Amino acid sequence: MDEQKINKILTYMGFAARANKIAFGKDMLKEYLSDKRISKKVLVVAKDAGERVKKDLRIRCDINKVPYIEIADKKTLAKAVGKTNLSAVGILDENLAEAIIKVVQAE
Protein backbone atom coordinates (compact mmCIF):
# COMPACT_ATOMS: atom_id res chain seq x y z
CA MET A 1 0.00 0.00 0.00
CA ASP A 2 1.40 3.40 -0.92
CA GLU A 3 2.15 6.20 1.52
CA GLN A 4 -0.79 8.36 0.39
CA LYS A 5 -3.35 5.62 1.16
CA ILE A 6 -1.74 4.89 4.52
CA ASN A 7 -1.92 8.59 5.44
CA LYS A 8 -5.58 8.72 4.40
CA ILE A 9 -6.39 5.70 6.59
CA LEU A 10 -4.49 7.22 9.53
CA THR A 11 -6.42 10.48 9.04
CA TYR A 12 -9.77 8.65 9.11
CA MET A 13 -8.60 6.88 12.27
CA GLY A 14 -7.80 10.27 13.79
CA PHE A 15 -11.33 11.48 13.00
CA ALA A 16 -12.76 8.36 14.67
CA ALA A 17 -10.58 8.91 17.74
CA ARG A 18 -11.65 12.55 18.08
CA ALA A 19 -15.27 11.40 17.89
CA ASN A 20 -14.48 8.74 20.53
CA LYS A 21 -15.44 6.00 18.04
CA ILE A 22 -12.49 3.61 18.40
CA ALA A 23 -12.01 0.28 20.12
CA PHE A 24 -8.61 -0.78 21.41
CA GLY A 25 -7.27 -3.23 23.95
CA LYS A 26 -7.89 -6.97 23.97
CA ASP A 27 -11.28 -6.99 25.72
CA MET A 28 -12.70 -4.00 23.85
CA LEU A 29 -11.63 -5.46 20.48
CA LYS A 30 -13.15 -8.88 21.27
CA GLU A 31 -16.46 -7.21 22.09
CA TYR A 32 -16.24 -4.96 19.00
CA LEU A 33 -15.53 -7.82 16.59
CA SER A 34 -18.47 -9.90 17.83
CA ASP A 35 -20.97 -7.00 18.17
CA LYS A 36 -23.88 -7.67 15.77
CA ARG A 37 -25.25 -4.12 16.16
CA ILE A 38 -22.38 -2.66 14.11
CA SER A 39 -22.73 -3.71 10.48
CA LYS A 40 -19.67 -1.99 8.94
CA LYS A 41 -16.47 -2.83 10.81
CA VAL A 42 -12.77 -2.71 10.09
CA LEU A 43 -9.76 -3.65 12.18
CA VAL A 44 -6.45 -1.85 11.62
CA VAL A 45 -3.40 -3.66 12.99
CA ALA A 46 0.22 -2.50 13.27
CA LYS A 47 2.73 -4.43 11.15
CA ASP A 48 5.06 -4.77 14.12
CA ALA A 49 2.40 -6.18 16.46
CA GLY A 50 3.24 -9.53 18.03
CA GLU A 51 2.63 -12.61 15.88
CA ARG A 52 0.34 -14.10 18.53
CA VAL A 53 -1.73 -10.93 18.66
CA LYS A 54 -2.00 -10.75 14.87
CA LYS A 55 -2.96 -14.42 14.59
CA ASP A 56 -5.65 -14.11 17.28
CA LEU A 57 -7.13 -10.97 15.71
CA ARG A 58 -7.01 -12.41 12.17
CA ILE A 59 -8.91 -15.53 13.35
CA ARG A 60 -11.52 -13.37 15.11
CA CYS A 61 -11.87 -11.20 11.98
CA ASP A 62 -12.33 -14.28 9.78
CA ILE A 63 -14.98 -15.72 12.10
CA ASN A 64 -16.91 -12.41 12.22
CA LYS A 65 -16.23 -11.46 8.56
CA VAL A 66 -14.47 -8.21 9.47
CA PRO A 67 -11.85 -6.69 7.12
CA TYR A 68 -8.33 -6.92 8.58
CA ILE A 69 -5.79 -4.29 7.50
CA GLU A 70 -2.10 -4.25 8.45
CA ILE A 71 -0.38 -0.86 8.14
CA ALA A 72 2.37 1.20 9.71
CA ASP A 73 3.95 0.44 13.07
CA LYS A 74 2.61 0.61 16.63
CA LYS A 75 3.99 4.08 17.25
CA THR A 76 2.42 5.55 14.08
CA LEU A 77 -0.90 3.82 14.72
CA ALA A 78 -0.99 5.08 18.31
CA LYS A 79 -0.04 8.62 17.28
CA ALA A 80 -2.89 8.72 14.75
CA VAL A 81 -5.46 8.11 17.50
CA GLY A 82 -3.74 10.05 20.28
CA LYS A 83 -2.68 7.04 22.34
CA THR A 84 0.63 5.36 23.13
CA ASN A 85 1.82 1.98 21.89
CA LEU A 86 -1.28 0.45 20.24
CA SER A 87 -1.20 -2.81 18.30
CA ALA A 88 -4.73 -2.71 16.88
CA VAL A 89 -7.67 -0.34 16.52
CA GLY A 90 -11.29 -1.04 15.65
CA ILE A 91 -13.36 1.73 14.07
CA LEU A 92 -16.81 2.06 15.70
CA ASP A 93 -18.15 4.68 13.28
CA GLU A 94 -19.67 2.82 10.32
CA ASN A 95 -19.14 5.67 7.83
CA LEU A 96 -15.44 5.97 8.69
CA ALA A 97 -15.05 2.18 8.61
CA GLU A 98 -16.60 2.13 5.14
CA ALA A 99 -14.32 4.98 4.00
CA ILE A 100 -11.24 3.05 5.18
CA ILE A 101 -12.43 -0.10 3.38
CA LYS A 102 -12.90 1.93 0.16
CA VAL A 103 -9.35 3.32 0.41
CA VAL A 104 -7.96 -0.21 0.73
CA GLN A 105 -10.12 -1.60 -2.09
CA ALA A 106 -8.98 1.20 -4.42
CA GLU A 107 -5.60 -0.56 -4.78
Indicate residue ranges for each PLM-predicted region.
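N-terminal targeting/trafficking signals and adjacent low-complexity tails
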Residues: 1-3
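Anion (oxyanion) recognition and catalysis
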Residues: 62
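N-terminal first-folded block
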Residues: 7-45
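Residue-level marker of positions within ordered structural domains that often coincide
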Residues: 18, 48, 82
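Solvent-exposed alpha-helical segments within well-ordered globular domains of core cellular machineries
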Residues: 11, 31-34, 55-59, 79, ...
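Short basic, glycine-rich beta-strand/loop surfaces that mediate nucleic-acid
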Residues: 66, 71-107
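N-terminal positively charged helical leader segments and presequences
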Residues: 36-58, 67
